[in-house]
Amino acid sequence: CYPTFGGSGVVATELGIALSKIGHTIHFITYHQPVRLETLNTDNIHFHEVEIPDYPLFKYQPYELALSSRLVDVVKAHAIDVLHVHYAIPHAYAGYMAKKMLIDDGFHIPIVTTLHGTDITLVGSHPFYRPAVTFSINHSDKVTAVSESLKNDTLRLFDITTKIDVITNFIDIKKIEAKVMPCKRDLLAPKSHKIITHISNFRPLK
């Protein structure tokens, strides 16, 4: 997953934490510790950093190659049962490459790909990326989308031959406390205006 405040990283992290609480061992594999992974003081949550060597030949460092190799290393070292990749680019593609490399070494691991939004509707649908995204989705063992709308967009924008199941995003309501906070609403907007709050990463699209 991406380790940022974006929805894909948050959902991936919270899902992993929730699974760890019911006895599963979770390994997060990304280029930085996820922002929602506040502690590693447990026996069944682990973080593996993807290091990207800086080689002058490359104008852009090949993160997908580094990620694929790291996935292979972690699967072999820790006997991982399943890879769950969040956000189609580049994680689904890297997951597929890791799976193929592992097969050559006698490891057979299923890939679950979760589609989150702009990885499909904005980035993934770009002509430069569409063939790789289509291939990665179709070669995943399981594909989920976070909404019916995203599922429909994926089917509309790509030639998808595999089933997509919808599993909506979630929150842990136990973390939320009902608090009444005094607020001078007129400082934000006139009474006739609605106030909408959006929380995400700080990309121009948002």
Descriptions of predicted regions:
Residues 103-112, 118-136, 152, 180:
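Nucleotide-sugar donor phosphate/pyrophosphate-binding loop at the beta->alpha transition
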Residues 138-148:
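A short beta-strand/loop micro-motif in the catalytic core of glycosyltransferases
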Residues 56-83, 92-97, 127-131, 135, ...:
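An amphipathic, basic-hydrophobic alpha-helix
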Residues 144, 189-206:
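Conserved donor-binding/catalytic core segment of Leloir-type glycosyltransferases
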Residues 5-6, 173, 203-206:
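A short, basic/aromatic alpha-helical/loop segment that forms part
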Residues 1-35, 43-48:
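N-terminal subdomain of nucleotide-sugar transferases
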Residues 32, 149, 170:
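Carbohydrate-associated surface elements
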